[in-house]
């Protein structure tokens, strides 16, 4: 990680494969929290390149726990960082209530007071990775919820670091791009 950080400190960019490997290593616990926080901070100080974002996304998709609910529309838009009302979760219930099946993918709020998982948990939703249970939920209620850490190990690995930083990071862009249910 030291060489990677020096490269980034010199205003160089990561290649797609390099970014992919880095996120895989983060998920596998090969870097400590300080190193990961340093890496995240670099991308707070400069824009992430398309190659870097694609590499990180590739890693998330390769490591995800796939869910075959592909006949339904996945929704995940990421937080706005403004501590506003969690509109996307409310919209999912509105859409489901109108008879349109929805798969919501989300997490606890890292940069706001209420992520989708916070809202769902407060309403008694028990998070699961059991696809059969999700299918039953779709059949009965037109909605299924995918708690991101159950389906993306890398997101689980960085959750405490993101919570500690308490600012929007490139993971806010990655989550919606790496929904376990691909359209």
Predicted regions and their residues:
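Phosphate/diphosphate-binding glycine-rich loops and adjacent basic-rich segments that engage nucleotide
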Residues: 133-183
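Conserved active-site and cofactor/substrate-binding residues in soluble primary-metabolism enzymes
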Residues: 13-21, 30-38, 48-55, 86, ...
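A glycine-rich phosphate/pyrophosphate-binding beta-strand-loop-alpha-helix module
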Residues: 40, 85-141
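Gly/Ser/Thr-rich beta-alpha loop segments that engage phosphate groups in nucleotides
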Residues: 80-83, 117, 177
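Structural motif
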Residues: 75, 105-107, 146-148
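Acidic, glycine/proline-rich low-complexity segments that act as flexible tails and inter-domain linkers
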Residues: 1-84, 94-98, 102
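Residue-level signal for pocket-adjacent positions within structured domains
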Residues: 3, 9, 115, 172, ...
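Short glycine-rich loop/turn motifs that provide flexible caps or phosphate-binding loops at active sites
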Residues: 10, 28, 77-78, 108, ...
């Amino acid at each position: 990680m030291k060489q990677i950080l020096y490269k980034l400190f010199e205003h160089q960019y990561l290649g797609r494969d390099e970014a992919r490997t880095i996120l895989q290593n983060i998920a596998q616990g090969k870097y400590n929290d300080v190193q990961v926080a340093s890496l995240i901070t670099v991308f707070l100080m400069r824009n992430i390149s398309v190659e870097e974002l694609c590499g990180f996304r590739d890693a998330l998709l390769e490591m995800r726990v796939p869910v075959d609910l592909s006949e339904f529309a996945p929704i995940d838009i990421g937080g706005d960082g403004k501590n506003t009302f969690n509109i996307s979760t409310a919209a999912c219930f509105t859409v489901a209530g109108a008879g349109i099946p929805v798969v919501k993918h989300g997490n606890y709020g890292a940069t706001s007071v209420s992520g989708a998982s916070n809202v769902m948990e407060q309403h008694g939703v028990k998070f699961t990775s059991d696809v059969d249970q999700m299918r039953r939920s779709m059949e009965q209620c037109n909605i299924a919820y995918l708690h991101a850490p159950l389906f993306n190990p890398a997101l689980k690995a960085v959750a405490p670091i993101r919570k500690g930083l308490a600012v929007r990071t490139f993971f806010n862009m990655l989550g919606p791009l790496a929904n376990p249910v691909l359209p």
